[in-house]
Amino acid sequence: MLVGCALGASGAALQGVARNPLAAPDTLAVNAGAHLAVTAAAVVGASLGALPGVAVAFAGGVAAAGVVIGLSGGPAASPVRLVLAGTAITLGLSSVTQALLVLFPWETQGLFAWGAGSLGQNGMGTVRAIAPVVVVAFLGLVLLGRRLDLLGLGDDAARSLGVDVARTRLVGVLLAVLLATCAVTVTGPIGFVGLCAPLLVRLLATWVRPLGRHRLLIPAAAVAGTALVLTADVALRAVFGPVSGVTVPTGVVTSLIGAVALVVLARRARAALEPDTLVTLRAGSDLARRAPAVLLGAGVLLLVGVVVAGVLLGDSTVLLGDVANWVAGKASVRLDIILDSRVPRVAAALLAGACLALAGALVQTVTRNPLADPGVLGVSHAAGLGAVVVIVLTSAPSFALVFGGALVGAVLAGLLVFGVTAGSGMASGRMVLVGLGTGAAASAVTTLLLVRTDPWNQNRAITWLGGSTFGAGAPQLVPMAVALAIGVLVAARTHRDLDLVQVDDVTPRVLGVDLPRSRTLHVGIAVLLTAAATAAIGPVVFVGLVAPHAARMLIGKRHRWTLPLTVVLGAALVCVADLVGRTAIAPAQLPAGLVTAVIGTPYFLWLLWRMRATSRR
């Protein structure tokens, strides 16, 4: 009850402060920031009680929410833009958290299930210690309700009525984040309660109008949040039994409910949920306009250098002459062992980066959203779920089975996104919302499988989910090479269509481009590319987001040049990540997917800042 009340009230307040129906502790990365802070405290050996745990989680949650709200444009941001910014920040923070779980398994033992949100982790002592904090924060938000109502009229109107907008917004965010982090401290991050509870109350407010005022909306959302959490807990006990049901995180059920809510919201939403003007950075330099081939050639040389460094460097350094002897079959046994494992890993990183970068470029173009990537459409998560199903249910799965599972998951996600958005002409904003819901559902089911499986399979799957090239060979390389070849051939034939699709919905139709068909084709190719890369090395984030942006900044928006440079930069990024993961803490290793998140998160923060600055001009 305490957790549901805190999350429901927190979500209602955040939506009021941000004037955004999709604002919530999940979508503003509050839960991810709090989770990372608590995990980091466990890594350094800090033994936190209830209230110190709240303080640590609060610091992480406030920092994450401040970054998302500040860099996405605050109240001026569209709902989809805010959610995309929060999702990307959440990906980065979650990847860092997962890296800590992999590197420090003993110090963080038990935090995986906690990170999914479980009610059976703390006794009444923790609840009694935190309850007064929740009550004080809750009452503070209720007292702030009238000012939140006035904020809904707009900043200028609120100021004219005597509201200190900046102070009201700051106090509202701090109290809402405090409630959310109290819940995180007790049970871990329980997903989407803060989104769904206010949504239910706002639906009721269409019949009971007083519920639209925050002094009633916040308590009503608290009640709805409590009902959601209790319903999820009862459902788990009914399905898995009174004993086993306690071991399954409650956040699994609430995340599934939230996923359904996002899909329903996408179907019923009007234009207000479409992305606002898709502001991008100035694309291309003077050199790119005069001689784009020179920039592309420089990118290829960079990739060659990265590949050579990846082959030569690692826990043991080899020379170019050693590689030549290995190719000629004259190397020593030691060199054979080193290069037989290292060269396929470098090749896997190269192909996976190229596949994910091309997939990201296609998704960003057809959705006309610079913050989109295959993960945003739920494809990456669904591919990961399909592969995890195979890993968990079979003792020694072949790569063919893992690839098949990933492909099935990715295709099902793509079909769901297409099916739900087909009636609206596959509008980009709806595609994004449905994709986010699909990804949330896939992540929830993945967590359920991992929690219910044995420790051996759980550790194996968690490591794979980090995105590792370890053990890569021909079975992994061939499907990626085939998928990349198909993607490159299609892109080469349709690059002019993509130039038109990125403009608006009208221009392509006027010039004879079948827009729904084009979106279907290119998202289908993105699904294939993502499935191949995910099956080979696991989920790798930010490549499909960062590489297309960097390519556009360097060489411009003409896809004839943008797509090849995107492929080159994506391949180089994952190769660098794999090299860093193999050498930074040798002989131990970090999965490449976690390193790309660490590299990609600062770049993405800078990107959001530049985009916001550009939108103000």
Where in this protein do the model-derived segments appear?
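Alpha-helical transmembrane segments in inner-membrane proteins
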Residues: 1-617
